[in-house]
Every structure is written in structure tokens, then in C-alpha cells.
């Protein structure tokens, strides 16, 4: 057999995609999901797009999340936990403003700064469809209880009614702002609310 007729071994192909290992893939995926949601909303998020954004194989997200909804629940849980920290910090600040006003301002800022995540938390079926003993339900309830506690400390009649009325005002403003109906910063409207 001469040199020209020898079979050549196929050259090994190298992948264009970088091989990337995350020390904390779960955290990297959640961060990538938050970024994607902030830019494009939750409706466009797929586990494949998330894997590309995180620089990992398309199967990698399935090591941590059963499906897309499982990932969205994890993002929403973190959102409610962050909202609770924000509200708790505002309530503990003290100062001339009432606790309700401080919490209201913090709530409005959170909603305004996290529009698409806020939509995921409050304008999706995730919380209503979650089992009451789930991490998501508990995280959502904690944020409401912080608001309820602050309103009831003020001695308003019927803390559930008052807290729900305060929450309805805040939520309504955040959603109106998110949908483009309120041009000014939400905190500027704080003095007009029935707090």
C-alpha cells in the first residue's frame, strides 16, 4: 500500500463551545436566569437559553431543576426572600417616617428596580398554584406578614383589611409603572397613598 492510498485517520474535532465548570452551578444558573428575566421577561426563558448564558451543556440545568417551572419557582423564592429582607431593613430603620411609610417606600423601590422578577413573583400562577407548605408559599407569606405586622402596629382597624388595602395600593402602583402608565418614580407618589 502506498502512501497515497493509506486511509487517513479523521482529525479530532474540537468543540467551539468552551468547556466550563462552575463551582456552584445552581447559583450560576439562578444568576443567569435573573439576568435573562430582567432583560426579556420570564416568558422567553428556556433551560437551553439558560445553559448557553451560563456557558454549560444544555443538559446541565436538569441536574438542579426538574423543568422550567422548577427554575422559575427558585427565582421567585429568592425574589420573595430579597423582598422580605428589604422590608425588614426598612422597618428597622427608625426615623421620622412611620414604619408603614418606610416599608411602602421599600416595596415600591423593590418593584420598580426588579420589574420582570416582580411580575414573575406576583403576576404569574406560581404562588397561587404552589402547595401551602412549599418554600415558595412560605417565602411569599413572610413578605406579606412583614407588611401586616407593620400595619397592625399602627393600630389600624382590622390588620388584614388594612394590610391588604396598603398592599393593593403598592402592588397597583408597581404594576402600573411596569406597564408604562406611571412615568414618575413611584416613591414620589408615596404621600398620595392612604397609609
Regions flagged by a language model, labelled:
Residues 1-24:
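N-terminal intrinsically disordered/low-complexity leader segments
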Residues 109-146, 175, 179:
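Short secondary-structure transition hinges
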Residues 70, 102, 106, 120, ...:
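Amphipathic alpha-helical interaction segments
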Residues 166-184:
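Amphipathic C-terminal alpha-helical segment
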Residues 23-34, 38, 43-44, 55, ...:
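An amphipathic alpha-helix adjacent to DNA-recognition modules
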Amino acid at each position: 500500500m502506498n502512501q497515497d492510498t493509506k486511509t487517513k485517520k479523521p482529525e479530532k474535532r474540537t468543540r467551539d463551545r468552551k468547556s466550563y465548570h462552575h463551582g456552584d452551578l445552581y447559583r450560576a444558573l439562578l444568576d443567569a436566569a435573573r439576568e435573562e428575566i430582567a432583560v426579556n421577561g420570564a416568558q422567553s426563558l428556556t433551560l437551553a437559553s439558560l445553559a448557553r448564558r451560563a456557558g454549560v451543556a444544555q443538559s446541565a440545568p436538569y441536574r438542579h431543576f426538574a423543568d422550567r417551572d422548577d427554575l422559575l419557582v427558585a427565582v421567585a423564592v429568592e425574589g420573595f426572600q430579597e423582598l422580605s429582607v428589604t422590608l425588614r431593613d426598612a422597618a428597622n430603620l427608625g426615623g421620622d417616617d412611620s414604619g408603614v411609610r418606610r416599608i411602602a417606600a421599600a416595596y415600591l423601590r423593590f418593584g420598580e428596580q426588579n420589574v420582570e422578577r416582580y411580575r414573575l413573583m406576583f403576576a404569574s400562577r406560581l404562588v397561587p398554584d404552589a402547595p401551602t407548605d412549599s418554600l415558595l408559599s412560605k417565602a411569599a407569606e413572610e413578605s406579606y406578614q412583614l407588611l401586616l405586622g407593620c400595619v397592625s402596629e399602627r393600630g389600624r382597624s382590622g390588620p388584614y383589611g388594612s394590610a391588604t388595602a396598603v398592599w393593593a395600593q403598592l402592588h397597583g402602583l408597581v404594576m402600573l409603572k411596569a406597564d408604562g402608565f406611571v412615568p414618575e418614580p413611584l416613591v414620589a407618589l408615596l404621600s398620595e397613598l392612604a397609609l
